[in-house]
Amino acid sequence: MDEEQLRALLRDLDALKQRPDPAAIDRMRERVAGMVTPAAAARSKIKDMSSEVVDSNPYSRLMALQRMGIVDNYERIRDYSIAIVGIGGVGSVAAEMLTRCGIGRLLLYDYDTVELANMNRLFFRPDQVGMTKTDAAVQTLSGINPDVTLESYSLNITTVKGFETFLGSLKARSSDGRNTGVDLVLSCVDNYEARMVVNQACNELGQTWMESGVSEDAVSGHIQLLVPGETACFACAPPLVVASGVDERTLKREGVCAASLPTTMGVVAGLLVQNALKYLLKFGQVSPYLGYNSLKDYFPTMEMKPNPQCSNPACVQRQKEYMQSKPARDAAAKAKMEAEASAADECPVHLDNDWNISVVDDSDTVTPSILSTGADSLPEGLVRELPTADSYQEPVAPVTSGAIDDDLEELQRQLDALNSS
């Protein structure tokens, strides 16, 4: 129901006040009036991002990254599509962050519904209990930023039908017709079966994705970048539960659940989205793997190479394709480096800027310590304890062992002469 419909309803209620019981109608009118306020507060869509620093511009702080030289063109973020699988503690927060960043298109996947037990996860509200997580996410995210295109899929990707729908949606054209496929997949699921399904889909499509997870004790987590053929897939070095073939659902016990801290979820979601932004907007260093241990504030990193004997045929095929294209990539990288080096030689040492900061070539200056003397660098009445560079004397050569032997012989003769007398 839009704002105009609500106002029409208010007019109808005003007309009904002629009835005998106006109190009930007044209460109804107050409830509807409360619905009009948020409807009026929702902003309209913004066509172009602006760097103008005004209170009414929701993108001014984001565009400042471009002005400060962190990102070349931040507005490119509107051209990208990201799929988030799992709208739980990490996925829902990641979706909110990307929405606030102004991502162009978000695809949301989950089959679960919102429960009161989810209220510690920073995102869902008690009034959304009973809604599917995807619908609840769309409801909240569309209010935060109406510029983002949101597509929700309430399905279980581990089923045959769900996997087919998931695979097709990753390749399909967006609802507005602007994008085809997705640029990145974020896995925020809480079980290994779903991770293996995401791994299979991305290997088949050659789709880059990032995996995330939080430990059962809620005090540690990780994120990982997976590029089919270039890095290890999830099946190249599977966890023990996956490698042993045990159905992880049989490991769960009645009345026992994993711990969940909103702080850890928020940290992992932040690391995940930060890595995604660096990957898409080409700034900083994209982490291949980054762990997080909150007990020791420890952030381990590592790289994982693909396993040539991986059990996933699609992964092995992507590895072959990656190796076949390696000479062309190396040649392109070399040409790019040479072009950048040539451009650097032609450009000035520094560009004009608003802060009057200049970069001075060290070769054009002389170190002040070489020009200064011992007298001009100290106040009157003070002298240097150590010699200056101009008055430095070569150290006395050490006495050789032969001279020491001669002195000992002379001393012995003197002692013998004294004893004889």
From Swiss-Prot:
One biological process term in Gene Ontology: protein ufmylation
Keywords associated with the record: ATP-binding, Metal-binding, Nucleotide-binding, Ubl conjugation pathway, Zinc
Active site: 257
Binding sites annotated in the UniProt record for ATP: 89, 110, 133, 156, 191
Binding sites annotated in the UniProt record for Zn(2+): 233, 236, 310, 315
Listed InterPro entries: D-isomer_DH_CS1, ThiF/MoeB/HesA, ThiF_NAD_FAD-bd, Ubiquitin-activating_enz
GO molecular function, one term: metal ion binding
Gene Ontology CC terms, in alphabetical order: cytoplasm; cytosol
Residue intervals passing through the bilayer: none
Domain of life per record: Eukaryota
Described function: E1-like enzyme which activates UFM1.
Family named by the database record: Belongs to the ubiquitin-activating E1 family. UBA5 subfamily.
The protein's name: Ubiquitin-like modifier-activating enzyme 5
